Amino acid sequence: MNKLFLILLLIFSHEVFSQTSAEVLQSKLNAIQTMTANFSQIVKAKNREVSRSSGSMALQRPGRFRWQTKDPLEQLIVADGQKMWIYDVDLEQVTVKNQEKGLGGTAALFLSGYDETLTHDFDVSEKQKGKLTVFDLKSKSAKENFQRIKLIFSQSTLIGLELYDQLGQITDVKLVQIKSNPKLPAKLFQFKPPKGVDVVKQ
């Protein structure tokens, strides 16, 4: 789940791509300043389902994010542009990281735009699949956590992602009940650890 959160944070980089398909993708991403949605996620390995989860998310550029998993285990990830909190409810534990530290070194700043070199790490292609537009990002380096990322749009709306990692796992995320550019309260991207939980700083 943390990896998915990181890759989503990566999606809204402000860096300009040099390729035509990348410019089209960047234009779509730049049009999204805020966003809310419900998600369902399936992780597969060797064509077998490894895990399934669902929940809700909220995003505000630059760098603010909320990813709340409700099923099967409750987890909340909140980023405010400076720090990132990961609250595992069942473990009664909160992990706190500096946001750049928590995101850096992965394919992870595609969403928040902290890493200016990230957009040079992927080759971007585009194809139509019926009424959908699929952007296929392939890593130029074998060292990236995610070797391939697909972003699926219905017109200007991001409705899904497919993430391919180094271990051969595929994470399929579908977004529904999507709202683009709603006004969001600041408290969505703030977090105060509940009383009695362990707080681990990294």
From Swiss-Prot:
<dbReference type="GO" id="GO:0030288">
    <property type="term" value="C:outer membrane-bounded periplasmic space"/>
</dbReference>
<dbReference type="Pfam" id="PF03548">
    <property type="entry name" value="LolA"/>
</dbReference>
<comment type="function">
    <text>Participates in the translocation of lipoproteins from the inner membrane to the outer membrane. Only forms a complex with a lipoprotein if the residue after the N-terminal Cys is not an aspartate (The Asp acts as a targeting signal to indicate that the lipoprotein should stay in the inner membrane).</text>
</comment>
<comment type="similarity">
    <text>Belongs to the LolA family.</text>
</comment>
<keyword id="KW-0653">Protein transport</keyword>
<dbReference type="GO" id="GO:0044874">
    <property type="term" value="P:lipoprotein localization to outer membrane"/>
</dbReference>
<keyword id="KW-0813">Transport</keyword>
<keyword id="KW-0574">Periplasm</keyword>
<keyword id="KW-0143">Chaperone</keyword>
<comment type="subunit">
    <text>Monomer.</text>
</comment>
<keyword id="KW-0732">Signal</keyword>
<dbReference type="InterPro" id="IPR018323">
    <property type="entry name" value="OM_lipoprot_carrier_LolA_Pbac"/>
</dbReference>
<dbReference type="GO" id="GO:0042953">
    <property type="term" value="P:lipoprotein transport"/>
</dbReference>
<dbReference type="InterPro" id="IPR004564">
    <property type="entry name" value="OM_lipoprot_carrier_LolA-like"/>
</dbReference>
<feature type="signal peptide">
    <location>
        <begin position="1"/>
        <end position="18"/>
    </location>
</feature>
<protein>
    <recommendedName>
        <fullName>Outer-membrane lipoprotein carrier protein</fullName>
    </recommendedName>
</protein>
<dbReference type="InterPro" id="IPR029046">
    <property type="entry name" value="LolA/LolB/LppX"/>
</dbReference>
